[in-house]
């Protein structure tokens, strides 16, 4: 059976997922789309989803599909995911699951009431080959992890990007993937602001350093520098009792030209994790065909949202160490 996929939100990521489903992956096709900007929906259909109908609302797309992808603005995610759960439809939701932790909690409660998993959150780094290999190395060779040094650097961000977005739009990936990497929970967060780059603007403090502590005592420092200029650069080094392990660099051709040894650095986040997007979405389609969901769960989205909210509070109190408190994990997500 070919799954009928509906896409809510046909911006860059929604359209790219439509291309992925129709041209790269197996077992599904995009049959319905919607977007608040009809021109965007029409461009998506014309470019990568010629068989899809354009509908007027998220509710119509959910009703017309076997499973849905929520790729709209983050503020709309909670309502649209809850509607998919109420309809019993598997739902892939791009991050954030909700813009506030209490919204993510409502999604968890709705899924619990349904009695089965229906939601997968788009934390694609868990599917990246480098992170998968790093997790296995941490598990089998390093001994107990002691520290993590990480960095998330973007060449630039638009003028509408503000200080809290460094947490909810950028650090959110590290919040999830490092929790997964360590199989551990956060207990505190702290934010420090170094000297600001001249390439930022009045509404954005850049760079930032976020310090996290886990229940097992692991200390994590994450540099967020979203106007670094030179490229899109993701770094992660785990320090264990027996040694260290580092996330590998993306595959690129090193050159020796003009008396210079060099290797290119990617500029676009889509290029850095393009393969992991394919793997995560195929994982969703496989589970959706069985009427359920796999991969990062609504609970993972909720845990990330709680941590992100505390980090934003820590931005407002630079240097203060604030507690991160998670409720007990429900049996559905054990």
Curated annotation (Swiss-Prot):
EC number of this enzyme: 1.1.1.18
MF terms in GO: inositol 2-dehydrogenase (NAD+) activity; nucleotide binding
Reactions catalysed: myo-inositol + NAD(+) = scyllo-inosose + NADH + H(+)
InterPro entries the record matches: Gfo-Idh-MocA_inositol_DH, Gfo/Idh/MocA-like_OxRdtase_C, Gfo/Idh/MocA-like_OxRdtase_N, MI/DCI_dehydrogenase, NAD(P)-bd_dom_sf
UniProt-listed SUPFAM superfamilies: Glyceraldehyde-3-phosphate dehydrogenase-like, C-terminal domain, NAD(P)-binding Rossmann-fold domains
Keyword list, A-Z: NAD, Oxidoreductase
Disulfide bonds: none
Pfam families: GFO_IDH_MocA (PF01408), GFO_IDH_MocA_C (PF02894)
GO BP annotations listed: inositol catabolic process
Family statement drawn from the similarity comment of this UniProt entry: Belongs to the Gfo/Idh/MocA family.
Subunit structure: Homotetramer.
Record's function text: Involved in the oxidation of myo-inositol (MI) to 2-keto-myo-inositol (2KMI or 2-inosose).
Protein name according to UniProt: Inositol 2-dehydrogenase
């Amino acid at each position: 059976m070919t799954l009928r996929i509906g896409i809510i939100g046909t911006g860059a990521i929604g359209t790219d997922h439509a291309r992925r489903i129709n041209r790269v992956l197996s077992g599904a096709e995009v049959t319905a789309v919607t977007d608040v900007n009809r021109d965007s929906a029409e461009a998506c259909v014309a470019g990568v989803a010629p068989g899809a109908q354009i509908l007027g609302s998220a509710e119509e797309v959910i009703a017309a599909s076997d499973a849905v992808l929520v790729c709209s603005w983050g503020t709309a995610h909670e309502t649209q995911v809850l509607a998919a759960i109420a309809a019993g439809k598997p739902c892939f939701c791009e991050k954030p699951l909700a813009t506030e932790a209490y919204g993510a909690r409502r999604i968890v409660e709705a899924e619990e009431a349904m009695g089965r998993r229906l939601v997968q959150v788009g934390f694609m780094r868990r599917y990246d080959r480098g992170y998968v290999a790093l997790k296995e190395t941490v598990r089998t060779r390093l001994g107990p992890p002691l520290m993590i040094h990480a960095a998330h650097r973007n060449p630039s961000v638009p003028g509408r990007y503000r200080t809290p977005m460094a947490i909810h739009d950028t650090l959110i990936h590290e919040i999830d993937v490092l929790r997964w990497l360590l199989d551990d929970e956060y207990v505190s967060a702290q934010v420090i602001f170094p000297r600001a780059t001249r390439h930022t603007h009045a509404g954005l403090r850049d760079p930032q350093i976020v310090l996290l502590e886990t229940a097992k005592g692991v200390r994590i420092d994450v540099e967020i520098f979203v106007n670094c200029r030179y490229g899109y650069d993701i770094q992660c080094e785990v320090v264990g009792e027996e040694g260290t392990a580092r996330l590998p660099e993306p595959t690129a051709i090193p050159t020796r030209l003009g008396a210079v040894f060099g290797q290119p650095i990617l500029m676009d986040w889509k290029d850095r994790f393009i393969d992991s997007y394919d793997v995560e979405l195929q994982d969703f389609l496989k589970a959706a065909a069985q009427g359920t969901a796999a991969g990062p769960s609504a609970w993972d989205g909720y845990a990330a949202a709680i941590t992100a909210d505390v980090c934003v509070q820590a931005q407002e109190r630079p240097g203060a160490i604030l507690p991160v408190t998670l409720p007990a994990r429900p049996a559905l997500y054990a």
